[in-house]
């Protein structure tokens, strides 16, 4: 049970912590001003809510 909690809490913190372009790049993401293209998903923002940080699956 403790291991499950550790895994779930680590995963949720990863996706919520990306708020600038440096953190985006560290998490192997890239910044785009539109929707995340193709087989990528949004993991945060880069320069405010309009610029998305995207990462491939």
Curated annotation (Swiss-Prot):
The modification Pyrrolidone carboxylic acid is found at residue 16. Neutrophilic granules. Keywords: Antibiotic, Antimicrobial, Defensin, Disulfide bond, Pyrrolidone carboxylic acid, Secreted, Signal. SUPFAM superfamilies: Defensin-like (SSF57392). Gene3D superfamilies: Antimicrobial Peptide, Beta-defensin 2, Chain A (3.10.360.10). GO terms for biological process: cell chemotaxis; defense response to bacterium. Has bactericidal activity. Active against E.coli ML35 and S.aureus 502A. GO terms for cellular component: extracellular space. The keyword Disulfide bond applies. Belongs to the beta-defensin family. PANTHER family: BETA-DEFENSIN, DEFENSIN BETA 4A. Disulfide bonds join 24-53, 31-46, 36-54. It is found in: Secreted. GO terms for molecular function: CCR6 chemokine receptor binding; chemoattractant activity. This is Beta-defensin 3. Pfam families: Defensin_beta. It comes from Bos taurus (Bovine).
């Amino acid at each position: 049970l403790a291991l499950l909690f550790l895994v779930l809490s680590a995963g949720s913190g990863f996706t919520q912590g990306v708020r600038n372009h440096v953190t985006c790049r560290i998490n192997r993401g890239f910044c785009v001003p539109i929707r995340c293209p193709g087989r990528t998903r949004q993991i945060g923002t880069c320069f405010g809510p309009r610029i998305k940080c995207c990462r491939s699956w």
